[in-house]
Swiss-Prot record:
Heterodimer with OrtB. Pfam families: OrtA. The keyword Transferase applies. Its EC number is 2.3.1.263. One of its GO terms (biological process) is ornithine metabolic process. Belongs to the OrtA family. Involved in the ornithine fermentation pathway. Catalyzes the thiolytic cleavage of 2-amino-4-ketopentanoate (AKP) with coenzyme A (CoA) to form acetyl-CoA and alanine. It is strictly specific for AKP. It comes from Unknown prokaryotic organism. Keywords: Transferase. This is 2-amino-4-ketopentanoate thiolase alpha subunit. It catalyses: D-alanine + acetyl-CoA = (2R)-2-amino-4-oxopentanoate + CoA. GO terms for molecular function: transferase activity.
Amino acid sequence: MSEKCKKDDWVEIHYVVLEARERTGDIPEDTRKVPLECWIKGWAEKEGTVGEEVTIRTPANRYVKGTLTRINPEYTHTFGPCASELSAIGQELRATLKEGK
């Protein structure tokens, strides 16, 4: 993996939204002790190196500045394991709708 990105490369940045001292008192104490952080993906507006501050354009066309953390990051979220109880619903619904025509 390259440590440098070019303009328009898909990248991930990190920035601190709120420092620990700026956080509200209405959250659990252990949460209040750490900063609120954000990792966000988008296209680099100019070339940069991991660890440098860069600006990105997000898929929603927002411009966000932060520290470059990764170049060409993958998506790591999932919808979890398959719920076998739900796997037949699509076919059952199609059959029910077809009967109604």
